[in-house]
């Protein structure tokens, strides 16, 4: 005779850490109610469920419309570590979607997240920096971060955070500095970025050089890069083992050598030789373009032009490059090098 046996295991489709999701349009409304619950476990389960749903931009749109962002803002100040971690994770996932970034700006999420910049939970800080990074990919998002006065805080955190979070901050800074580098320049960002160029981590070196490209766009940025003796370090990085580090270092030199002081600082650091060496190795498009433009800047100085005259064939070879931008850059370089007063 058969006996009834009750399994000690739950069915495979039941997750005890996640709130049950209601059917259809009621799903997010119910979760939003649970986010506001006084019961800790209910809040935690609702956040875990929300993390899954926010990968779909349609759910993100609906969540914003029913007021989930306001509930999440409140939970950022929760005493429970897991609640804060999952709240920042939900916001980070929402920020990967355009509709989420727009919602952040409308609901002042930038300032709300900034309260956790010094949170003792590493995952909280990592998630909020990921959210800022994705938000900054939207020009208005980058402007929002700048206008919120967060750039000095990000520069300070860059000196204290763990390596993997430093990488995220550098990505955010590079995007924000393209919009406005004023606050960064006033916050000693150039000396900080100079220090990061010397990091043992190639990702940090690469991203620091990329941020220097952005901060060198305004004249004050170019002057600070020269005054802080960053140019010799950038020249050294042209021989780095990492391709992206070399490309970004060449890009930073391209901007920094627009000024006369920058040109001669690069010439004194013997920048021409490693730049020419990069062109002779059939580099990738970005590296080739940046190196060509940097050499063009150096050719504007009589000493640079004299050194480059015998290397014009390298640039003539680039005239047949498959990339039109490199063709144009090579054409300009030849004109500058062969120019006679």
From Swiss-Prot:
This is Radial spoke head 14 homolog. The keyword Lyase does not apply. Belongs to the flagellar radial spoke RSP14 family. Component of the axonemal radial spoke complex 1 (RS1), at least composed of spoke head proteins RSPH1, RSPH3, RSPH9 and the cilia-specific component RSPH4A or sperm-specific component RSPH6A, spoke stalk proteins RSPH14, DNAJB13, DYDC1, ROPN1L and NME5, and the anchor protein IQUB. InterPro entries: ARM-like, ARM-type_fold, Armadillo, RSP14. The keyword Cytoplasm applies. Keywords: Cell projection, Cilium, Cytoplasm, Cytoskeleton, Flagellum, Repeat.
């Amino acid at each position: 005779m058969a006996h009834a046996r009750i399994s000690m295991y739950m069915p495979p489709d039941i997750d005890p850490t996640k709130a049950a999701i209601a059917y259809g349009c009621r799903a997010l409304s119910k979760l939003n109610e649970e986010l506001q619950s006084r019961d800790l476990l209910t809040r935690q389960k609702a956040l875990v469920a929300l993390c899954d749903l926010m990968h779909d931009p349609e759910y993100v749109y609906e969540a914003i419309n029913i007021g989930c962002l306001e509930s999440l803002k409140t939970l950022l100040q929760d005493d429970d570590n897991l609640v804060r971690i999952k709240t920042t994770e939900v916001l980070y996932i929402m920020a990967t979607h355009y509709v989420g970034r727009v919602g952040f700006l409308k609901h002042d999420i930038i300032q709300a997240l900034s309260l956790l910049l010094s949170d003792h939970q590493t995952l909280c800080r990592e998630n909020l920096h990921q959210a800022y990074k994705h938000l900054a990919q939207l020009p208005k998002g980058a402007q929002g971060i700048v206008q919120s006065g967060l750039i000095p805080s990000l520069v300070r955190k860059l000196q204290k955070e763990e390596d993997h979070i430093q990488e995220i901050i550098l990505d955010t800074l590079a995007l924000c500095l393209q919009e406005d580098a004023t606050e960064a320049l006033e916050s000693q960002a150039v000396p900080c970025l100079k220090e990061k160029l010397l990091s043992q981590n190639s990702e940090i070196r690469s991203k620091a050089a990329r941020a220097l490209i952005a901060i060198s766009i305004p004249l004050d940025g170019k002057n600070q890069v020269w005054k802080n003796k960053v140019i010799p370090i950038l020249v050294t990085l042209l021989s780095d083992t990492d391709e992206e580090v070399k490309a970004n270092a060449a890009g930073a030199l391209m901007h920094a050598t627009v000024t006369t002081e920058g040109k001669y600082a690069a010439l004194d650091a013997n920048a021409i030789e490693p730049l020419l060496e990069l062109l002779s190795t059939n580099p990738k498009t970005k590296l080739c373009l940046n190196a060509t433009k940097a050499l063009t800047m150096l050719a504007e100085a009589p000493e640079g032009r004299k050194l480059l005259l015998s290397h014009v064939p390298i640039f003539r070879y680039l005239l047949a490059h498959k990339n039109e931008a490199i063709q144009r850059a090579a054409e300009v370089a030849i004109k500058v090098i062969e120019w006679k007063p």
